[in-house]
Amino acid sequence: STPSTKETAFWENGKHCWATPKDLSGKQFPVLMDTDRKITDAGLAKISSGLLPVGTVLLSSRAPIGYLAIAEVPTAINQGFIAMKCNGVLSSVFVLMWCVESMEAIIGKSNGSTFQEVSKSSFRSLPVVISPALILDGFSKIVEPLYRRIVVNERESRFLARIRDVLLPELISGGVRIQNAE
C-alpha cells in the first residue's frame, strides 16, 4: 500500500519514481519516463513490490482499469497497478500488446461495488498463448526497433518541451532576442 503521505521521511526529497494511474493517464505513447511524485528510500522500504526494473509493464487495475505503459525508469507503484516483469520468454512490448488486445477480457475480470478493480488473482487466470520461439524472435526483430524509436522520440519531445519552457518566458519578456527574426 501507499506509504503515509503525512510522513515526510517517505516523500520529502524523494529520488525514486512513484507511479500512480494518474501518471499514465493522457499518455500519447505507452512509455513511462518519469512520475509526478518521488519517494525516498524510507518510503520505498514500506512497499512490498519494491522498485520495479526498467521494462516492467504497468497496467492500471482500478480507477480506471486499462492504462498501460512500459517503465523506462526504475519505478515504485501504488496498489492501483498490476506490474508485469518481463524477463523471460515474452518481451515487454509483446506483453503490452497482449494487454491491449486482451483489454476486454481483462476488464471482464473486474468486480467491486464502490469501483471496479481487477485483482491480481483474477488477472493471473487469463490465458496467454505463447508462440514458438522463432515467431517470438521474428516479432521482436520487427517491433522492438519501433518501440525503441518511440522511446527516443518521447525523450526528445520531453527535452524540447523543457527548452521551450525555459526560452519562451525569456522571449516574451525581452530577456532574449533573436537576431534577424523579421
How would you describe each model-predicted region?
Residues 30-31, 174:
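Juxtamembrane "helix exit" motif at the C-terminal ends of alpha-helical transmembrane segments
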Residues 27-28, 68, 106:
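Residues that scaffold the ATP/ADP-binding catalytic core of kinase and kinase-like folds
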Residues 89-90, 94-105, 109-116, 121-182:
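Amphipathic alpha-helical coiled-coil/heptad-repeat segments
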Residues 1-30, 43-49, 64, 111:
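Low-complexity, Lys/Gly-biased intrinsically disordered segments
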Residues 8-18, 31-39, 49-53, 67-79, ...:
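Short, surface-exposed loop/turn microsegments at beta-strand edges and helix-strand junctions
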